[in-house]
Structures are given as structure tokens and as C-alpha cells.
Amino acid sequence: MRVLDSAPVTLGRGAQNDLSLDSDDFASARHAKIEPRRDGVWLEDVGSTNGTYVNGARIGKPRRLAPGDVIRVGSTDLRYER
């Protein structure tokens, strides 16, 4: 579990990410970013090769997350809870 504060959280295979998925061969080195904003928490794909998914649908632009959403980065599933 990771608690979000006001800072964005980066996800990917590279060690430079806040949440490193180093054992996931399908995650890009820099894959996605989760960013708390005034109007909610947003997920953005940052140019990954295999895409970022929410509830099974690939996102093409930033998407606001809702509690219970399942985020897929590479072959890793993460659940967003408020």
C-alpha cells in the first residue's frame, strides 16, 4: 500500500520511479504517473509501450480515478482506494 499526499507518484520498471515495478517485464521504464489534484486523483500514461489500463480499458489521456478502480501497468494490477 502507498499513501498519496500532494506529490505525484511515478510508476514503472526503472529504479527512479516512486513505485518501482522492477520485476515486471511488460512495464516501461517510465510508465505512468498518479497525480493528486484539487478535483481528484488523476492517472496518466507517460508514453509507455504497452499502455496503461483502468478497469480493463486503455487510457489515451489523463483519467480521474474513482475508489475501487483497478489500474494495470505492464502485468501489474493495482487497486485505487480513497
Predicted regions and their residues:
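Forkhead-associated
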Residues: V3-R82
